C-alpha cells in the first residue's frame, strides 16, 4: 500500500517540475521528500495511513503558496464541480428534516419528482425499502440515498395528507439544475431586478431568461445583485459581461510567471448594452463577481452600489492527478480593463483569513472614509476618466453602510438555530390549503398577509418548547420584531412558492438595494450620463 502512494507522491512532484527542465536542486528536493516518507513508513512508532499522510503533505505544500491553491480529494471532486457545472444527478426535490422526518419542501420544476407527481408537504418515510423516518439521518446521508448515477431508479414511499395509505413511487434519476439566478422580478413598473448567487455553466442562459422577461414587462433600469456571490467560472463572468458591454471591449486580463498575458473581450450583441445598470456588491462578493463589477465600472457602463468587494483575483487552474484527485493551482492574477489588480494582499495569511473581521473593526463597513488608499492605487475609468481604486477588491461608486440597528443576538440565534425554517415548514404543512384558499396568488399574499400577534405568540411558544437553552429576550425581541416579521413572511413565501418570492419580500430590508432604487428614482443615475457614454 505504501509503495503505491510513494510512487504517486513522487509522480505528483515530478509532474509539477516537468513544465520546465528539472535542475539538480529540484531533484534533490523530490528525493528529500521521498526519503522522509520512507523513514516514516519504516521507523515511526505507530502505523500510518499512507493516503492520509500524502494528502496532508499536499495540503500543507499548497497552503504555503497562497490562500487559494487547494487540494481536492478524489471523493470530493464531483461535489466540488457540481455547483459550477450547474447541475447534479438526483430526483429533483428540495427537502428538510423536520422532527426526524424527511419532508419535501419543493420539487424542482421540470425534474423527475415533479413529473411523477411528488408534492410539497409529502413525507418520505422509506427509500429502497429502508426506513428513513425517526432514525436520525443527517442531510448528507439523505442526499447519498437520493443521488446516484444518471438513469438509475430509486424507490420511495411517502405519506401524504388526505391519502388513506402510503404512496409508492419509482423515480428515474436525472440531471437536476442548480440555479445560479435566485430571483428576477419587477420592483417598480420600470425597475427590474436580478439576483445572481454564483457563476456557473448555466448562468448566461438564466440571466438571459431574466432579462427577456423583465424587458417584456417594460424594464428601463436593471439592478443586478451580486451581494454574497463568491464567484465561480471565469467564462461565465465573461459571457455575462458581454451581455452588458458593446463592441469588443476588454473585460479582464490575466498574467502570471508561467502564463503570458491573456485578454478576454466582449464580442457579441448583448441583451442589455444600453439602459441603466446598477450592480450591488458587498464584502462577500468575490472573484467572478469582481471581474464583472470591475469591467462595468472601468468602461463606465453602470454604477456599483454597496460596499468594497472581497478581493480575490487569483487564477486557479484545475489539474487532475493520476488517482482522480485534483489540485487547483494559482497560475496568474486577474486585472480589470484599467489595469487594477483585484487580489488583496496575502503576505500575512493569518490576517488574510481574518480580513473581514479586521475591516469591520476598523469601521470600513460603517464609514466610507475609513478606507485610506494611497495615490499609487488610483486609476481612471476608460471613458469618463473617473477615479477608481486598486489594491484589492472593487470599491463602489456609492457606499452603503451596513445597518445593524435591527439585528440582535436573539434574532441571530433564531435564524442560526433554524427555528424560523422549521416553524414555517410545520405551519405551511398544517395550513397549506387554507393559505391558498385565502391567497390565490403570491401577489395577494405579499399585499395582504400579515404576521399578527397570534402568529408570533405561536412561534415564540414553539421556540420555547424546542430550544430550552435559548432564553426569550424581550428587549432584543422588540428591537428585532419588525425584521423578524419580515423574515418570517419571506420564509413562508419561500416554502409556498419558491426562492424568488422570498427575495421579493425580504428585499424590503436590503439597504443596498433600497439605496440603488433611490439612485434611480431621485435622478442620481441620470446625472452621471453613463447611459450616453457607451
Identify the role of each PLM range:
Residues 288, 300, 307, 311-379:
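Polar, glycine-rich mid-to-C-terminal structural blocks
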Residues 20-29, 33, 37-50, 73, ...:
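Cleft-lining beta-strand/loop regions that shape enzyme active-site pockets
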Residues 124-125, 154, 342, 388:
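Generic structural signal for buried aliphatic residues
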Residues 34, 44-105, 151-183, 506-517, ...:
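Extended, small/polar residue-biased N-terminal targeting/export presequences
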Residues 127-128, 159, 330, 345, ...:
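Residue-level recognition of conserved beta-strand edge/terminus positions
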Residues 133, 168, 328, 343, ...:
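A sequence-level detector of short linear motifs
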Residues 1-26:
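Bacterial Sec-dependent N-terminal signal peptides
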Residues 341-342, 346-534:
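Conserved functional hotspot residues or short segments at active or partner-binding sites
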Amino acid at each position: 500500500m505504501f509503495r503505491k502512494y510513494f510512487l504517486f507522491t513522487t509522480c505528483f512532484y515530478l509532474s509539477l517540475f516537468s513544465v520546465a527542465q528539472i535542475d539538480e536542486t529540484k531533484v534533490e528536493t523530490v528525493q528529500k521528500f521521498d526519503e522522509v516518507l520512507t523513514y516514516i513508513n519504516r521507523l515511526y512508532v505507530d502505523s500510518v495511513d499512507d493516503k492520509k499522510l500524502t494528502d496532508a503533505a499536499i495540503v500543507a505544500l499548497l497552503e504555503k503558496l497562497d490562500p487559494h491553491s487547494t487540494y481536492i480529494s478524489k471523493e470530493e471532486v464531483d461535489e466540488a464541480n457540481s455547483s459550477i457545472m450547474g447541475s447534479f444527478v438526483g430526483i429533483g426535490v428540495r427537502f428538510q428534516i423536520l422532527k426526524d422526518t424527511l419532508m419535501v419542501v419543493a420539487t424542482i420544476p421540470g425534474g423527475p419528482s415533479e413529473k411523477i407527481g411528488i408534492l410539497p408537504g409529502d413525507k418520505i418515510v422509506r427509500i429502497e425499502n429502508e426506513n428513513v423516518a425517526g432514525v436520525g439521518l443527517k442531510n448528507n446521508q439523505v442526499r447519498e440515498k437520493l443521488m446516484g448515477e444518471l438513469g438509475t431508479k430509486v424507490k420511495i414511499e411517502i405519506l401524504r395528507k388526505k391519502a388513506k395509505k402510503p404512496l409508492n413511487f419509482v423515480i428515474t434519476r436525472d440531471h437536476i439544475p442548480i440555479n445560479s439566478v435566485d430571483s428576477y422580478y419587477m420592483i417598480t413598473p420600470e425597475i427590474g431586478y436580478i439576483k445572481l448567487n454564483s457563476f456557473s455553466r448555466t448562468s448566461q442562459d438564466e440571466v438571459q431568461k431574466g432579462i427577456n422577461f423583465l424587458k417584456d414587462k417594460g424594464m428601463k433600469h436593471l439592478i443586478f445583485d451580486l451581494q454574497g456571490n463568491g464567484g465561480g467560472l471565469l467564462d461565465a463572468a465573461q459571457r455575462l459581461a458581454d451581455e452588458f458591454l458593446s463592441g469588443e471591449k476588454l473585460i479582464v486580463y490575466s498574467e502570471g510567471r508561467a502564463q503570458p498575458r491573456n485578454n478576454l473581450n466582449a464580442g457579441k450583441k448583448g441583451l442589455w448594452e444600453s439602459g441603466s445598470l446598477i450592480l450591488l456588491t458587498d464584502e462577500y462578493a468575490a472573484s467572478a463577481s469582481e471581474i464583472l463589477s470591475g469591467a462595468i465600472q472601468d468602461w463606465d457602463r453602470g454604477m456599483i452600489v454597496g460596499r468594497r468587494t472581497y478581493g480575490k483575483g487569483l487564477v486557479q487552474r484545475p489539474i487532475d492527478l493520476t488517482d482522480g484527485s485534483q489540485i487547483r493551482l494559482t497560475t496568474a492574477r486577474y486585472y480589470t480593463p484599467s489595469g487594477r489588480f483585484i487580489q488583496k494582499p496575502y503576505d500575512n495569511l493569518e490576517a488574510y483569513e481574518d480580513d473581514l473581521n479586521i475591516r469591520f473593526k476598523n469601521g470600513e463597513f460603517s464609514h466610507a472614509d475609513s478606507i485610506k488608499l494611497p495615490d499609487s492605487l488610483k486609476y481612471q475609468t476608460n471613458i469618463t476618466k473617473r477615479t477608481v481604486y486598486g489594491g484589492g477588491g472593487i470599491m463602489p461608486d456609492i457606499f452603503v453602510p451596513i445597518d445593524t440597528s435591527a439585528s440582535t443576538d436573539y434574532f441571530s440565534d433564531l435564524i442560526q438555530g433554524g427555528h424560523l425554517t422549521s416553524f414555517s415548514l410545520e405551519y405551511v404543512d398544517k395550513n397549506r390549503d387554507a393559505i391558498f384558499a385565502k391567497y390565490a396568488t403570491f401577489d395577494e399574499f405579499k399585499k395582504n398577509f400579515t404576521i399578527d400577534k397570534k402568529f408570533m405568540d405561536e412561534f415564540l411558544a414553539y421556540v420555547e418548547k424546542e430550544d430550552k437553552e435559548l432564553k426569550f429576550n424581550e428587549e432584543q425581541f422588540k428591537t428585532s420584531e419588525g425584521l423578524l416579521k419580515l423574515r418570517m413572511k419571506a420564509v413562508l413565501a419561500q416554502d409556498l412558492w419558491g426562492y424568488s418570492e422570498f427575495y421579493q419580500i425580504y428585499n424590503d430590508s436590503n439597504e443596498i438595494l433600497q439605496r440603488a432604487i433611490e439612485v434611480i428614482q431621485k435622478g442620481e443615475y441620470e446625472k452621471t450620463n453613463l447611459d450616453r457614454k457607451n
